[in-house]
């Protein structure tokens, strides 16, 4: 079933959400972050973590694009969902995109992503979505590329 662009898809959530969150949480724990546990899903920012007295807010998403680093990323820009901009109302957050096919991820901060100059309104027509959606296309050089082994 196709969903209107910009709307929540339960099937995509079920397939990707826990995978992405668990993968990032394990990575953060290895880096000595403390993860705030959620009692139940609140459909708010995915992860809240602390390190050295600082609070980090993190949104996790799976990207169907294959990459291992900036050089192998197949596009000049990285596309971030406009509907996640609401999380920046409470302040800066880190937006992580995971490559499910290997051990790589990229991230960028919301203050860089959600600038008007990167905003793009686009007609979407895929097997899963249709209609008008908002994206922010950030030059890949402004994103941080990593593997979970680093």
Feature roles, as predicted:
Residues 40-42, 87-91:
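Short solvent-exposed loop/turn micro-motifs enriched in small/polar/acidic residues
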Residues 58, 96-97:
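Hydrophobic/aromatic beta-strand patches that form the interior of the parallel beta-sheet core
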Residues 64-87:
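Mg2+/Mn2+-dependent nuclease catalytic core
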